[in-house]
């Protein structure tokens, strides 16, 4: 994901919901963790370098 696309995120959340309905909780959690990591990485790339506080290092 190079840029935030709300429609794409909504589609991926819908896929996770389908996986949950099917009863495959492990895969659903794994997919959510991947989505979270991608979104956090994207935010980190778009945020200017701000010095971290000691508890974030």
Curated annotation (Swiss-Prot):
What cystine linkages occur within this chain? none
Q: Which Pfam families match?
A: YciZ (PF23675)
Record InterPro entries: UPF0509
Say which family it is in: Belongs to the UPF0509 family.
* Alphabetical list of HAMAP family matching this protein: UPF0509
Please give the name of this protein: UPF0509 protein YciZ
């Amino acid at each position: 994901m190079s840029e935030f696309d709300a429609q794409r995120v909504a589609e991926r959340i819908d896929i996770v919901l389908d996986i949950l309905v099917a009863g495959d909780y492990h895969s659903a959690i794994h997919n959510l963790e991947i989505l979270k990591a991608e979104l956090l990485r994207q935010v980190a790339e778009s945020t200017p370098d701000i010095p971290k506080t000691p508890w974030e290092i």
